Amino acid sequence: MLTGCGKAAEDDARATASASVTDKTDRTDKAADNTGKGDEERDKGDKADPADAAAKGVESGGRIGAAGSACELPVSFDIAAQWEAESIADASEDLPEEVAALEWRQGPVTVACEVDAKPAGHIGFLRIWTGAPGDAAPRAVLEEFLGAEQGVSEEKYQPFEAGDLAGAEVEYLYASQLTDEPKTERALAVATPDGPVVLHLGGLDTAEHEAMLPAYELAKRTLRAS
């Protein structure tokens, strides 16, 4: 059984069976067409700044995290247009509790939500992991998160701030038997009264990761405590 990012890598690799050169070309064209488009008017403080999002070539497709949203979390943030969020509690409801725990846990956190990029033409997920309340610093959470995964190297940590939150971010290489060469991945962590939250962006390969990076940056810029 695969766990954590290893499972994500297998998910991404299997998805290539349905991807083609035409798909790659189409989504490249779509990304170019979307560059410069403004976001729709949004409630104050609830959405990313339209000009900022447009400058990054990504539009907001809504906000998750608050009560009543697709995923209820200790934080809230904007997700990119066409990306689809699903609560892992819903996705794993048919699995025995002990199996679900092994399948979705990595280090101090467990997957609570995943945002699928496939509807937007990419192969990968933005996954949100949550943990029990405690006093661990965000960087320590990230170090334990990556320490639970084999194949991680060249970690580069840095602090970041978003609204009322301060946290840590890491860019690193992940090597798997399913890939020909190491690929770039990213994760960030913040501490909340309800426990740590980790946002992780993988991808089929480094090229896919970079193509999805604007969606990750949108989530990071608009991250707020719920």
Set out the residue ranges of the language-model regions.
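N-terminal targeting sequences that direct proteins away from the cytosol to non-cytosolic compartments
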Residues: 1-103, 204-226
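Conserved polar/disulfide-associated segments of primarily extracytoplasmic proteins
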Residues: 72, 88-183, 189-193
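Hydrophobic/basic alpha-helical segments enriched in Actinobacteria
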Residues: 83, 170-174, 178-181, 185-189, ...
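Calycin-type beta-barrel ligand-binding domains and close structural analogs
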Residues: 150-156, 188-189, 198, 217, ...
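Short, well-ordered beta-strand elements
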Residues: 195-204
